[in-house]
């Protein structure tokens, strides 16, 4: 990471410096890259991570990634936990969905606040599940095929989450 920062500062056509201002932008882009739908982090998590906004540049210049790894580890833990829970009880969760009830889901997550609690995060997950089921229904899928499709989708996401390596984390961090 030190070499990457040095090259960025030496070769950028605008003479870009990785300073506190850029660190703050990088922090936001990294959080958004990990959790674009805002379904893994709560507002409390984001508030706790804010202590790193002005540290990413300093850490990178020293070759440290501890802040990035701490953020990523919580993301991965929540992702695996949620996808495991979802795949283990998908059919009952689908069966409980009420399509007569009018509900809204902001599809542009940047306009949504971070969930205030675990319950609010789970509610957002429920709305995304309902949206996925509804889209498959509208595409003409039968109920059993919907369950199978979503189970495969979530199992694949879980498998990918469990296979992430430290190089993958570095790549996500360096490319945001």
Annotate each PLM feature.
Residues 1-176:
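Flexible, low-complexity junctional segments that flank or bridge functional domains
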